[in-house]
């Protein structure tokens, strides 16, 4: 699956960035070491495992975390949206 994703991104000249929490940087790591593709497709990633990072770096509203939990779909969606401001050159931002 990783190889297919990397190949599709490379074929379409797309750049990806990751905003990770639960995966703790695993996706960024895997995409970065993919043979001959890492530098061509990966812009970077941010690991925001601790809610304080979500709040201070990504600027997630603390009330959203209080209402839904730091691992909720609502917070994850907001992380993705806010991650687009950090990685403006990314065609795709993935948050998990």
Identify the meaning behind each predicted range.
Residues 1-96:
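Short alpha-helical segments enriched in small residues
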């Amino acid at each position: 699956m990783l190889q297919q994703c990397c190949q599709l991104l490379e074929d379409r000249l797309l750049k990806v960035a990751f905003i990770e929490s639960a995966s703790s940087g695993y996706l960024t790591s895997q995409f970065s070491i993919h043979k001959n593709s890492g530098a061509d497709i990966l812009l970077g990633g941010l690991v925001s495992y601790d809610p304080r990072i979500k709040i201070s770096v990504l600027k997630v509203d603390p009330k959203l975390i209080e209402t839904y939990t730091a691992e909720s779909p609502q917070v994850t969606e907001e992380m993705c949206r806010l991650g687009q401001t950090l990685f403006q050159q990314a065609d795709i931002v993935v948050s998990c």
